[in-house]
Curated annotation (Swiss-Prot):
Name of protein: Elongation factor P
A Gene Ontology term for the protein's cellular component: cytoplasm
Source organism: Streptococcus thermophilus (strain ATCC BAA-491 / LMD-9)
Pathway in which the depicted protein is active: Protein biosynthesis; polypeptide chain elongation
Gene name tied to this protein: efp
SUPFAM superfamilies reported in the protein's UniProt record: Nucleic acid-binding proteins, Translation proteins SH3-like domain
Length: 186
């Protein structure tokens, strides 16, 4: 059992009514009067829906035991993403709504890890950094480095990130998948 005050982003837990929830954001909140509460943004792992809720810090939940296996992203068709276990060659179908954030960072044939809760496939874990190519960005302007604000760039997966002014279309970039931000040129 884990207390609500110990839940952090990325953790998965089971509620008293059997829902499997993943924490997207968690913060302590102390109102002017009354007790501290934990405000959380959660995703129902099975349905893919996200919602905001509050818990008392002392509320207890069962922490979900999540196992991972190495896999490869094959392709997406309609509302389903297809993955293959690289050890057993078993294929898994995952609804896109459950992995839409992760799909922003991976291309076909990318290595990932499939997450299981018991025998149920619940999601995909991508590497902390990936290399993606810039498909579209504004041209560089001489002397524009003084502001340092950067410019938006569209990557080959459709993800838009803010990049420095010297980045041009066609360049490969290292992207942080946790924050969805530019790290460096590859």
């Amino acid at each position: 059992m884990i207390e609500a005050s110990k839940l952090r982003a990325g953790m998965t837990f089971v509620t008293n009514d059997g829902k499997l929830l993943k924490v997207l954001e968690a913060s302590h909140h102390k109102p002017g009067k009354g007790n501290t509460i934990m405000r959380m943004k959660l995703r129902d792992v099975r349905s893919g829906s996200t919602f905001d809720t509050s818990y008392r810090p002392e509320e207890k939940f069962e922490q979900a035991i999540i196992e991972t296996v190495p896999a490869q992203y094959l392709y997406q068709m309609d509302d389903t993403a297809y993955f293959m276990n690289t050890e057993t060659y078993d294929q898994y179908e995952i609804p896109v709504v459950n992995v839409q954030e992760e799909l922003k960072f991976i291309l076909e044939n990318s290595d990932v890890k499939i997450q299981f809760y018991g025998t149920e496939v619940i999601g995909v874990q991508v590497p902390t950094t990936v290399e993606l190519t810039v498909t579209e960005t504004q041209p560089s302007i001489k002397g524009a480095t003084v502001t340092g604000s950067g410019k938006p760039a569209t990557l080959e997966t459709g993800l838009v990130v803010n990049v420095p002014d010297f980045i041009e279309a066609g360049q490969k970039l290292v992207i942080n998948t946790v924050e969805g931000t530019y790290v460096s040129r590859a």
